[in-house]
């Protein structure tokens, strides 16, 4: 017996795209598969995509990509919902525009997303890979010859000030487009006291769970590296202060602009934004992909309106990961790194500034309600979601890559320092 991945087979892809082109239905035993087109592509050939995707993705011809969802959940997948809304209701062009979709409608009236067809974007890879390569060049070549990381980065493509600012501007335009969509499930919602409490409880739960797992990891000799173990102890020591700040409402008072201008609006966001979700075109422009949200989160949570600060925090954490992973390569590959680690961490600090400069340069001129007005309140909001993301990363690394646990642990301590999370 020979087993193949049918979702990558040419016959399957051709059949599905034919059905989308013709708006065809396929009757099943307890429901019907329905396929609809928004201008599909014909005369395709199939090319598999080799990458770490949750779902099956193939390129059909040069202008169309077909994604088949492996994990089916009742309801419309946000990748289809958000992608279709951006395609049909906005002028935002920095996405893979949706060309068709496939759903399963059960006899019980429940609908499931099974596939989505988008345009295939000519690209040179995702931003994670491109930035990693650029940072490696930075510490190999630039760090030893140029005193300033920003000057060294100017010749390193994606780690240059211009590129990072343009990436920030792209995400700013994405949020403006999402905020403009007037459809059920989109639009804006105010941040209420219940919203603030929900954020606080979510962070406390995630942080408390991660701290418990860190304590367990420290009891396993050799499980964590010496550096990670040292950082883990510092995070555990900082946890009571953070917990007290959350319980006393210090963070809420900081974030709410002292009740003058609120915490901005809630909108539909990307939900799982990081450098791996950004493609870079050959001309240097960026394209945002994969609006599914965190795959393991419940559908209702992925579809819920959120603060745009959550997406921004995801990007900032991704910059941190890129810099720290480059630092690991610099100190472990045997090449003369010298001051490379310091240069990379300095670059990360600069990249935060460049990204936020590009982002708010786009947003502030077009919408004064997405974010709090005061810089201090914005920083508190971003820090909240950064530290929540970092605790999520701690759990992931302990379970999958304990050698990388030092990266999110360092991030937690850095965010606490910026936020003043040791206050009571």
Name what the model sees in each region:
Residues 30-44, 210-268:
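An alpha-helical support segment within catalytic cores of ATP-dependent transferases
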Residues 252-262, 297, 301, 366-381:
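Acidic, serine/threonine- and proline-rich low-complexity regulatory regions
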Residues 183-186, 215, 219, 327-331, ...:
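Structured alpha-helical bundle/scaffold domains in large eukaryotic membrane-trafficking regulators
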Residues 278-280:
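Hydrophobic residue at the +6 position relative to the catalytic HRD Asp in the kinase catalytic loop
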Residues 111, 224-230, 238, 245, ...:
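A generic "structured core" feature
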Residues 1-212, 283-285, 289, 293-345, ...:
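Conserved ATP-binding subdomain of kinase catalytic cores across diverse folds
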Residues 272:
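Conserved catalytic-loop position in the HRD/HxD motif
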Residues 230, 333-334, 338, 342-376, ...:
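ATP/Mg2+ or Mg2+-diphosphate-binding catalytic cores
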């Amino acid at each position: 017996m020979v087993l193949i991945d049918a979702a990558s087979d040419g016959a399957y892809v051709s059949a599905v795209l034919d059905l989308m082109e013709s708006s065809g239905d396929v009757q099943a035993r307890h429901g019907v598969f329905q396929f609809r087109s928004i201008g599909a592509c014909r005369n395709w050939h199939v090319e598999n995509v080799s990458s770490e995707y949750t779902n099956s993705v193939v390129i059909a011809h040069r202008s169309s990509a077909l994604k088949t969802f492996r994990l089916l959940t009742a309801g419309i997948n946000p990748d289809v919902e958000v992608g279709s809304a951006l395609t049909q209701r906005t002028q935002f062009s920095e996405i893979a525009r949706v060309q068709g979709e496939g759903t399963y409608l059960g006899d019980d009236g429940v609908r499931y997303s099974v596939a989505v067809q988008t345009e295939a974007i000519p690209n040179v890879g995702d931003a994670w890979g491109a930035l990693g390569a650029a940072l490696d060049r930075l510490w190999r070549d630039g760090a030893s010859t140029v005193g300033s990381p920003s000057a060294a980065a100017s010749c390193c493509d994606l780690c240059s000030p211009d590129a990072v600012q343009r990436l920030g501007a792209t995400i700013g335009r994405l949020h403006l487009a999402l905020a403009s969509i007037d459809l059920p499930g989109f639009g804006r919602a105010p941040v209420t006291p219940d919203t603030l409490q929900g954020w606080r409880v979510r962070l406390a739960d995630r942080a408390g769970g991660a701290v418990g797992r860190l304590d367990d990891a420290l009891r396993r000799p050799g499980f964590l590296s010496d550096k990670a173990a040292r950082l883990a102890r510092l995070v555990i020591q900082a946890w009571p202060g953070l917990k007290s700040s959350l319980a006393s409402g210090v963070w809420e008072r900081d974030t709410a602009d002292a009740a003058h201008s609120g915490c901005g609006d809630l909108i539909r966001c990307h939900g799982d934004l990081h450098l791996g979700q950004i493609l870079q075109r050959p001309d240097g422009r960026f394209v945002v992909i994969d609006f599914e949200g965190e795959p393991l989160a419940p559908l209702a949570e992925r579809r819920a309106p959120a603060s745009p600060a959550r997406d921004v925090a995801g990007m900032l954490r991704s910059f941190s990961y890129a810099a720290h992973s480059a630092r690991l390569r610099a100190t472990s590959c045997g090449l003369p790194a010298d001051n490379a680690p310091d240069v990379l961490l300095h670059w990360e600090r600069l990249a935060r500034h460049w990204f936020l400069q590009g982002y708010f340069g786009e947003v502030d001129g077009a919408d004064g309600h997405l974010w709090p007005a005061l810089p201090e309140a914005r920083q508190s909001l971003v820090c909240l979601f950064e530290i929540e993301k970092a605790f999520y990363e701690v759990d992931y690394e302990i379970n999958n890559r304990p050698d990388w646990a030092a990266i999110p642990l360092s991030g937690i301590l850095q965010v606490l320092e910026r936020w003043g999370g040791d206050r009571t």
